[in-house]
Amino acid sequence: MNASQDTIYAQVSEHISDFQFDSRVAGVFSDMIRRSVPGYTQIINTIGDFADRFVKPNTQVYDLGCSLGAATLSIRRQIQGRDCRIVAVDNSESMVIRCQENLNAYVSDTEVELICGDIRDIHIENASLVVLNFTLQFLPPEDRDALIAKIYQGLNPGGLLVLSEKIRFDDAPIQSVLEELHLDFKRANGYSELEISQKRSALENVMKPDTLSTHQQRLTHQGFSHFSTWFQCFNFASMVAIK
């Protein structure tokens, strides 16, 4: 079996601890997210396309919750020669260590400052692009408005926020069918019923999805005047908001 294959929840566990981005997860994260999040590769690639169009010379880019650096790498490939700086932040030391290894594997003239820290503590300024790629959902709900407000204040006029999230639906039948289709997606990618069940239990207390309308209301309330959901597959979506 490949050491980078996600088998974290493949064995029966009497006690399921809350999910955390520790060294075990960091070691298999690329496999885990590819097999768990429909459209993840497209989202990553398109973040690079957004960067190509929105990142201005001599500005900063923020990847908040950068994990292994997939979005940062996608952005960096598209903004060569613009004298920009990418600030990539994650609060998991294990993720940051592996992210640095991934960044070191490619030569670039774009500086990346990699920070192990809490995204809520990061000062944002002179930003032309901010990315929250499946990150906001792990923050306590009461902290989300303040982070979006900080991002809005730190973005330059015309700057872009890319926000990707697992979402929920107020409409119960829609929630049920899209959630089941997502589970079918995971089954098709080789996850067993045991793995699906145990991971759901691990995430229950740490990931709290919002509805699309909640996201839009939050963004509008903080000042964003342009908003769209550019991608959705089942109960996963990626949104853009322009200042």
Curated annotation (Swiss-Prot):
Key words, A-Z: S-adenosyl-L-methionine, Transferase
Oligomeric and partner information: Homodimer.
PANTHER family given in the database record: CARBOXY-S-ADENOSYL-L-METHIONINE SYNTHASE, TRANS-ACONITATE 2-METHYLTRANSFERASE-RELATED
InterPro entries according to UniProt: CmoA, Methyltransf_25, SAM-dependent_MTases_sf
Homology family: Belongs to the class I-like SAM-binding methyltransferase superfamily. Cx-SAM synthase family.
Example GO BP: tRNA wobble uridine modification
Keyword Ion transport: no
Transmembrane regions listed in the UniProt entry: none
Name of the protein in question: Carboxy-S-adenosyl-L-methionine synthase
One MF term in the entry's GO annotations: carboxyl- or carbamoyltransferase activity
Record function comment: Catalyzes the conversion of S-adenosyl-L-methionine (SAM) to carboxy-S-adenosyl-L-methionine (Cx-SAM).
EC number: 2.1.3.-
Lineage of the species this protein comes from: Bacteria, Pseudomonadati, Pseudomonadota, Gammaproteobacteria, Alteromonadales
Domain of life: Bacteria
Binding residue positions for S-adenosyl-L-methionine: 40, 65-67, 90-91, 118-119, 133, 200
Catalytic activity annotation: prephenate + S-adenosyl-L-methionine = carboxy-S-adenosyl-L-methionine + 3-phenylpyruvate + H2O
